[in-house]
């Protein structure tokens, strides 16, 4: 049994003191996800907090219906989407993601980012979830609420575009 599953079982039994450890396991990943999707850094931090509050609130509805990680990313996705609707602003610059993660940019990085940025949103989201967040195809399908075969074909299409 993984540590995540152990914590989930304890929380399901009402041992709420284990939330802190479970949240700690995913905090950085969800923060990076929200930085990528939120209009600015402060809203990303708000989105992370709101994500975990909603996960705690709606956890009884989860009840081991698939991977917890996919459930968590789905909640984060919904929170960020709600923020975008409220702000009605353009997508955050990719520079923010690099500054947050401390990556240095090379010319190749810049060219690649420009090509990724040029992808349609639906393809860009799948590429980001697959390679930046390292979600499985099945987890991406759950997060985006689309069939796994659709995820596979869209990822294949995105990679084909990026190779050109």
Regions found by a protein language model. Give the residues of each.
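N-terminal module of bacterial RNA polymerase sigma factors
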Residues: 1-29, 36, 117, 139, ...
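Amphipathic alpha-helical segment used for protein-protein interaction
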Residues: 9, 13-16, 88, 97-143
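Sigma70-family region 2
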Residues: 12-13, 50-67, 86-87
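C-terminal flanking helix
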Residues: 27, 31, 52, 120, ...
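Structural recognition of an alpha-helix C-terminal capping motif at a helix-to-coil junction
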Residues: 32, 46-53, 66-78
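Arg/Lys-rich amphipathic alpha helix in sigma70-family domain 2
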Residues: 60-64, 74-94
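DNA-recognition helix of helix-turn-helix
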Residues: 77, 81, 123, 132, ...
